[in-house]
């Protein structure tokens, strides 16, 4: 139930980005070429982990900053660079949120930022987007592939800025990043669900 609620929150934030967005996913070819800045207020990095095999427990990170270079005619030129404040982590339990920021988990005091930097972007049939790159978390850098699709594009009716929104999914193994408390009983595989909104920089 928690996972479903967070997933709904992550995806729903993009549904009203554009008054011109179609009911079906728009074509990546419709996106304007240029450099985009992350709309931090509407970008969330959700995660889900098996809680001792009983439930899938979810939380999210917020406050991401960074840039996205888009060239629809030449996807090989696309580039994504994101920085995430680790202490932005939030769950439905305040005590757990505080624990996750501590030294036994993400240690946000020592490692205040996580980052993702793409190395290649490919657009496949049907507009499926594959992003390869490196995730740096807890002082460790590992490869991470994201599978994304365009959610919407157009002028945001509130900010009046040209905006594009994507949803992306990926998986990491937390022990690879030195976050190993209670492993393997507490799930090692972490599923990522990312809602990303980006505003064209004039």
Question: What does each model-found stretch correspond to?
Answer:
Residues 1-5:
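Positively charged n-region of N-terminal signal peptides that target proteins for export
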Residues 7-16:
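Bacterial N-terminal signal peptides
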Residues 21-202:
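Low-complexity, acidic/polar, glycine-enriched regions of mature
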